[in-house]
Amino acid sequence: MCGIVGATSERRVTGILLEGLKRLEYRGYDSAGVAVIDADNHLKSVRRTGKVQELKDAIEQNPLDGTIGIAHTRWATHGGVTEANAHPHRSEDEIAVVHNGIIENHERLREELQAEGYVFNSQTDTEVIAHLIHHERKTHGDLLAAVKSAVRQLEGAYGTVVMDTQYPERLVVARSGSPLVIGVGIGENFVASDQLALLPVTRQFIYLEEGDVADINRTEIDIYDSEGNAVEREVVESDVSYDAGGKGQYRHFMLKEIYEQPIAVRNTLEGRLSEISVLDNAFGENAADILKDIEHVQIVACGTSYHAGMVARYWLESMANVSCNVEIASEFRYRKSYVHPNSLLVTISQSGETADTLAALRLSKKLGYKGSLTICNVGSSSMVRESDLAFLTRAGAEIGVASTKAFTTQLTGLLMLTLGIGKYRGMPEQQQEAVVHALQALPTKLEEAVSLADEIEELAQDFANKEHSLFLGRGNQYPIAMEGALKLKEISYIHAEAYAAGELKHGPLALIDEEMPVIVVAPNNDLLEKLKSNVEEVRARGGLMYVFADKNARFKGDDSLTVLNVCHCDEVIAPIVYTVPLQLLSYYVALIKGTDVDQPRNLAKSVTVE
């Protein structure tokens, strides 16, 4: 969600901070700010609502010069979208703080600090941290000790960076429930919430663990664990492309990432399949020791990743012969649930930092699961580090808030997991081999799906003035209908709902009229004839139908029924292939409506708060 950048250097850092914020815009935000300590040891800051460019323009009018500074993009939680609520927050013109997360006991701390004479200028929970650290520094006489004492009093999640005019070369950072990464330079060091922000200045990174506090200056980095012990954390060289944050020839990141799906899936498959099945080491060392005993799979995820899990349930139960439950992470973690014997906990997250999913993973360690596996796109993430097994999707950096290539590579990984478990559960070798061949054909099928873009762009014109829409699917295409509805509402702001087509008579049929477009994701299996009956029910009531169907399904269009013929593919990979036309439909509808495709209102890319 919010983005953090900090730097301590021998050179001026304002440009570094602004470039870092620019590279974090994809995370979603509504205001931004920068603070530096200048040559006279004065704290200077500029904050603005709106885009980073507006902040940059303001700084050009009132330059900020300093060799140490912090910066932030805010996504409002406590308090409205105002300049006063934007970060960095200050205390007594000495302490400046940026913070990601939510402090749950901020009201009590605010009252205590007000009683001590501190004056609050915002509605945020973050300003509490600034005043609390200032108060503790008066007691302890040192910034590091003050931060350690302050964070022990915080309840909730935080990733925070602090600077102090009394220590004008130091940044003190702390994380609990919100990720932070330190960038290691030569004569300079950095900190950020995402390594993408720092790729222009370093490729050497230290990923802080839960509960870590770090004291950073230009030449030294001292890290302390949650018990206060000095620790060494590994320095990792990033292989993420420097230009991963660029759009190239494409108008939007989302379109670029839709077109990248064939290569992203090809990369995800590379080196992980034999001729007859999936290699166990695709899921980590000693994966076979866990997978061979699995009798049940519990999938936990949020949003688009939850839809991927729902598709996987069909695969796992029909081919791998294991039972499977799929639950939204924010529900799973707050209820008592039954843990089946020999159960595998599977978390799915693009970032590996999704707050509720990460909390569910940590909860599972107390519940008796056989093991945990994460399907994730970020190898350095908390979920990867804290899971027993990990499948990395190799999608590359995904910048658009609406997930595209992360989703299709998650589905690819989940189908491979079905093979990985199924081969120990009696899945016939002939069936395994057929799935392998389908996966090997998948990148080419995705290229064919992307080639429908011009046809879908024309189709999108029909949706430009609609306020509502209905998506229908059956079998493993039902979750794809859900994903299509989510994409349309996310980026075009058209209200969209998805239903299993068999539920049409149980309520949704009441909504059908000539103003309600109905999008149908048609399976090419024994459910096809059932779905054709549902189509006729809608047509009989004057509904406008748009059917995405296998070109061999022989759907015939007319004035009330538009058919988009999708390339023929193996039934097992159809949910992945049919995802692409629905993504393109959402993109082109949003383009026509003039919405912010890459940064839709009120949404964030990485949801790192509850």
Curated annotation (Swiss-Prot):
Active site residues according to the UniProt entry: C2, K605
All residue ranges annotated as the SIS domain in the record: 287-427, 459-600
EC number(s) in its UniProt entry?
A: 2.6.1.16
Q: Name one GO molecular function term.
A: glutamine-fructose-6-phosphate transaminase (isomerizing) activity
Q: Which InterPro entries match?
A: GATase_2_dom (IPR017932), GFAT (IPR005855), GFAT_N (IPR047084), GlmS/AgaS_SIS (IPR035466), GlmS/FrlB_SIS (IPR035490), Ntn_hydrolases_N (IPR029055), SIS_dom (IPR001347), SIS_dom_sf (IPR046348)
* Major location (coarse): cytoplasm
Q: Name one GO biological process term.
A: protein N-linked glycosylation
Which UniProt key words apply to this protein?
A: Aminotransferase, Cytoplasm, Glutamine amidotransferase, Repeat, Transferase
Reactions this protein catalyses: D-fructose 6-phosphate + L-glutamine = D-glucosamine 6-phosphate + L-glutamate
Known role = Catalyzes the first step in hexosamine metabolism, converting fructose-6P into glucosamine-6P using glutamine as a nitrogen source.
Protein name from the UniProt record = Glutamine--fructose-6-phosphate aminotransferase [isomerizing]
- Which gene name belongs to this protein? glmS
